[in-house]
A protein has these predicted regions:
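Long, low-complexity serine/threonine/glycine- and acidic-rich segments characteristic of extracellular
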Residues: 36-42, 65-71, 75-160, 184-192, ...
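Bacterial N-terminal signal peptides that target proteins for export
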Residues: 2-13
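Short, compositionally biased P/S/T/A/G/V-rich stretches that sit at domain boundaries
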Residues: 29-61, 156-182
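N-terminal intrinsically disordered, low-complexity tails enriched in polar/charged
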Residues: 7-9, 29-35, 268
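Bacterial N-terminal signal peptides
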Residues: 12-22
Length: 268
């Protein structure tokens, strides 16, 4: 893809309105699911779509597997069927600022990349150069939500001959702040080469996450994220825990779409 020049930044008034709307919309956890007592509210009031493995100033080589996250209790909903409130699908903006008109559908071109199947990642194949990237969530009609990322300006130093298709392998993973954490702490979910959706959409080839938190002694806590959520904040009692993340089929109820991912953590 050729190098492109970013357009001028949005005006301050529009940004202020976006932030206020995002804060009003963000809730944690989902209002339609009774949360487990160990679930906690996110420290930040605003919801955002974000990069989980890329930050402003990074220098990368392509092809590069870029991964997405979504906070504030929002969930992924493919465009095949309407999702509930606080749902949408990801968009990657390349050298484009946020739109000033959030009542106009996002265009389809090489600067607005749509992920309408509920994807959580893409492979960048950009040529060497400097780019500004950002994430933006939009609804079934591709109308933007006030859920987006800060811009990340990156430099592609080299484009390799690697086949991009080899970088994305079906599977799930979870990400923690570290092996030792303090409450509340975030658990981020990820699905590679698999699609995430609301259970109620009943779409083939999609799933929803289920997290099982097992203490060193006592009963495990099982949390189902049936509205497409891809992260959770937890505040369990101090101790040692094993976390297991699954992506369950939304049609063949209870059937995993990939082997579970596990991690151990100590809460102090």
């Amino acid at each position: 893809m050729p190098s492109m020049n970013p357009i001028p930044s949005r005006n301050a008034l529009t940004l202020a309105l976006m932030l206020m709307a995002s804060a009003a919309q963000a809730q944690s956890p989902s209002a339609t699911e009774k949360p487990h007592p160990w679930q906690a509210a996110a420290p930040r009031l605003t919801a955002e779509a974000y990069f989980t493995n890329l930050k402003d100033g990074d220098r990368i080589e392509t092809p590069y597997l870029l991964k997405f996250g979504l906070s504030g209790g929002w969930g992924l909903a493919p465009i095949a069927q309407p999702g509930r409130t606080k749902s949408g699908h990801h968009h990657l903006l390349i050298n484009r600022d946020l739109p000033l008109n959030f009542k106009q559908a996002l265009p389809f071109n090489d600067q607005y990349i749509h992920f309408g199947k509920g994807q959580m990642e893409t492979v960048l194949t950009l040529a060497p150069g400097t780019y500004t990237l950002r994430m933006l969530l939009a609804d079934q009609q591709h109308l933007p939500h006030f859920v987006y990322s800060k811009p990340a300006t990156i430099t592609v130093t080299k484009k390799n001959a690697t086949d991009p298709r080899t970088l994305s392998v079906p599977g799930v993973s979870l990400q923690l702040e570290g092996p030792v954490v303090k409450n509340p702490f975030r658990v981020q979910f990820h699905a590679s080469a698999l699609n995430v959706a609301h259970l109620a959409q009943r779409l083939p080839d999609t799933g929803h996450f289920r997290l099982t938190v097992t203490p060193a002694s006592g009963a495990p806590a099982v949390m189902a994220f049936v509205e497409g959520q891809t992260e959770v904040w937890l505040a369990p009692p101090a101790g040692n825990y094993t976390l297991q993340l699954e992506l369950l089929d939304n049609v063949k109820t209870g059937q995993p779409l990939a082997p579970a991912a596990t991690a151990s953590v100590r809460v102090e």
